[in-house]
Amino acid sequence: MNMDFNLFMNDVVRQARQEITAAGYTELKTPEEVDEALTKKGTTLVMVNSVCGCAGGIARPAAHHAVHYDKRPDHLVTVFAGQDKEATARAREYFEGYPPSSPSFALLKDGKILKMVERHEIEGYEPMAVITKLQGLFEEYCEEV
């Protein structure tokens, strides 16, 4: 049974990775990739991915649809909590003042945290509510494309 569970979880993780990269987010798997991506000029949205139900049912759909907006971040990236542990830990170092949370979204500008949408603002909400929250941040902090 353990072998079946591992195969199942590998499929869940693979699908979760594919969903977010298909939405245009660049996957960061190492601390070095995180540093390179999060210190770029401009605004960066980080989606902290996970395998929980609220990630698949709410956060990833919101990540996909929120960026179809007049104003949006310059860069879209993702780290995977529980999978790419070192990359996720490094990303969280940039989220100063916020506790670890997954799934979650962090909006940064020039490597500095602006705002986060934490798990408690995702879990139990409809995807549209999270999309609206993200687009509100884009409206406030991002440039029109």
From Swiss-Prot:
InterPro entries (UniProt xref): BrxB/BrxA
Source taxon at top rank: Bacteria
Signal sequence, renumbered to the chain: none
GO biological process: cell redox homeostasis
UniProt-listed Pfam families: Disulph_isomer
Family of the protein in this entry: Belongs to the bacilliredoxin family.
This protein's name: Bacilliredoxin BLi02578/BL01507
Organism annotation: Bacillus licheniformis (strain ATCC 14580 / DSM 13 / JCM 2505 / CCUG 7422 / NBRC 12200 / NCIMB 9375 / NCTC 10341 / NRRL NRS-1264 / Gibson 46)
